[in-house]
Amino acid sequence: DFNGSIWNALEEAVQAIGRREEIYIVTGVTFNKGNENKEIKYVKPKKDASQKCPIPNYFYKVVLRVKHSGNTVTDARAIGFWFEHKAYGTKAKDFENYTETVDKIEEWTGFDFFINLPDKLEAAAESASPNWSEFKNW
């Protein structure tokens, strides 16, 4: 089960950081990765089978940590996670194997995250090596 395993483990790990400092998180879904044209599956409600709801093919989460001097952001680090919507079994901690740069997730989704950061900090944070151990210990 996707939500009860790998996604839940990721959310708990991110929340652990958020309990001790300010972080910014963007979570979303998408049906295609970049320009691909993947089949979209639907679920129909039991009460009205004429209706249907699309099931996302991918889930992503991008997380930003910042350091301040007063009200000025002096440094930033970001990491992204990208998952195909499927069962991941009991290897919940394996979320560390699904990291991506935020730049890559922006490319795949068409979104521009963290636009309020100074450009130089945004560019460095979004292109940083997507290593979970480095990110959580930064």
PLM feature spans:
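Domain-level detector of nuclease and nuclease-like folds
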Residues: F2-W138
